[in-house]
Regions:
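Extracellular beta-strand-rich solenoid/capping regions of secreted or surface-exposed proteins
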Residues: 42, 57-70, 77-97, 101-121, ...
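Extracellular beta-strand solenoid repeats
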Residues: 51, 62, 70, 78, ...
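Acidic/polar low-complexity surface segments
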Residues: 101-116, 123, 146-171, 176, ...
Length: 437
């Protein structure tokens, strides 16, 4: 048998082409092989945690039993451009403090730095650094995962659509995604068909969408920050979302986009400096730098938010009616409201409306409310949309005369938005200040 094997090797080595093929096959096999994490030089401490010493660990690894893995400084998983960095298929696994580099970039195969399989219930992925072309963390059909304080960076040399998402939840329940920093990936956090999850305190920069919801219900989006994305918060086909205390700064196209959203709450959010740009997505058209865009969304509460210095403050269309909109501030937007529908919408609740920086009314009884209604998209506004050059006369006596005629002869009015009790002062000053950190 030894002689036969030796003869075979001699035959291979005697042919240069066969040598190359043999080497390539050997390299491919070793790169694709998934190794048990227990093959690494793990050291257990008194708290039953397994420590991975500093060093570069090449290849893909699997965790198939409950354990806590803590990487010492300098411990690096280098997947050599193939597959996942680590695949977890057991419950109650913790991976903390590790660095993941150069995992696979096959998005169809869902290549990820850390891939949590359905059996990985209760996984904790904490304080890791990830840099690569595929997905950062993919959580697949499991419950109660905690993704905390991870730093995830994509590859800016690739087109946005060719990168993986920083964090991807699919069919997940009870996940906590807290304090992560994601940049230069495709979407920062993508939530698909996943209910009852919490996204809190994440920073999401230089992405397509910062937060992207699809078919996900009963989720909380709290105190997150998006910057320089092509849409800060893309909320689509979902219900019962609680979106509070978030910030959108210098995003393109949309700060917050609501598409088929129902029975949800938007409160205490701050959106500023949204400018127009390319969405890179055929699903969404008409991007004009809108702080808030509401498309075919009903029965939502939108209260005590601040929208400023954007091309459009708020745009409603496609049957977006029966929403509670009050106590918001619309400040310094080039166009405060764009509304396309067939019936009048009242934007005040219990005698209190919104603050509009371009409101020209007065408050003779000092009750903090304007004495005349604010109508941001009356016939005069429609005239300004059709002929932008007329905007030079915006506050002229002629324009005010047209508005007076419209109020005096309401038969001329077309359906639009009315705020019957506009606020004379904004109530959202506390939202304007820069966040700590």
């Amino acid at each position: 048998m030894v002689e036969d094997r030796s003869a075979a090797m001699t035959a291979i080595l005697g042919n240069p082409i066969k040598v190359i093929v043999f080497a390539l096959l050997s390299m491919s096999g070793s790169a694709l092989a998934v190794q048990p994490i227990t093959d690494l030089p793990l050291q257990q401490d008194a708290q039953q945690r397994w420590h991975l010493p500093a060093g570069e660990y090449r290849g893909s690894f699997s965790v198939d039993s409950p354990m806590q893995i803590v990487c010492e400084p300098g411990a690096v998983f280098q997947a050599q451009g193939q597959g996942n960095g680590v695949t977890v298929s057991a419950p109650d696994v913790t991976i903390e403090g590790c660095t993941f580099l150069d995992w696979g970039h096959d998005l169809t195969a869902m290549n990820s730095a850390v891939f949590l399989q359905p059996k990985a219930r209760g996984a904790v992925i904490k304080g890791n650094r990830m840099q690569g072309q595929g997905f950062g963390i993919w959580v697949d059909s499991t419950h109660d995962a905690s993704l905390i304080d991870n730093d995830i960076q994509g590859d800016p040399t690739l087109r946005s659509q060719d990168r993986g998402n920083g964090i991807h939840l699919y069919a997940v329940r009870g996940a906590k995604v807290i304090g992560n920093h994601v940049r230069e990936a495709r979407d920062g956090i993508y939530i698909d068909t996943s209910n009852g999850n919490l996204l809190q305190g994440n920073t999401l920069e230089d992405l397509r969408y910062g937060v992207h919801y699809m078919f996900a219900n009963d989720n909380q989006v709290i105190d997150n920050i998006t910057r320089r994305t092509r849409t800060g918060y893309a909320l689509m086909q979902s219900r019962k979302l609680t979106v509070t205390g978030n910030r959108s700064e210098q995003d393109q196209n949309y700060g917050i986009l609501m598409n088929y959203i129902t029975y949800s709450t938007l409160r205490d959010n701050f959106v500023s400096d949204v400018r127009d740009g390319s969405t890179g997505d055929t699903m969404i058209t008409g991007a004009e730098g809108k702080a808030l865009f509401i498309y075919n969304s009903l029965f939502n509460s939108i209260e005590h938010n601040h929208f400023e210095r954007s091309a459009v403050g708020i745009h409603l269309t496609a049957g977006s009616e029966d929403n509670r909109i009050a106590d918001n501030a619309f400040v310094g937007n080039q166009r405060q409201v764009k509304y396309v529908a067939t019936r009048l919408q009242e934007w005040s609740i219990d005698g209190r409306g919104n603050y509009w920086s371009d409101y020209l009314g007065w408050d003779r009884n000092n009750d903090g409310l304007g004495d005349i209604a604010y109508e941001p998209n009356d016939n005069v506004d429609r005239l300004l949309w059709m002929y932008p050059q007329v905007r030079l006369l915006m506050n002229s006596p002629g324009i005010e005369l047209l508005r007076w005629v419209q109020r005096a002869f309401p038969v001329m009015k077309s359906p639009g938005v009315m705020d019957s009790h506009p606020l004379m002062k904004s109530t959202t000053e506390t939202l304007i200040k820069e966040p700590i950190g």
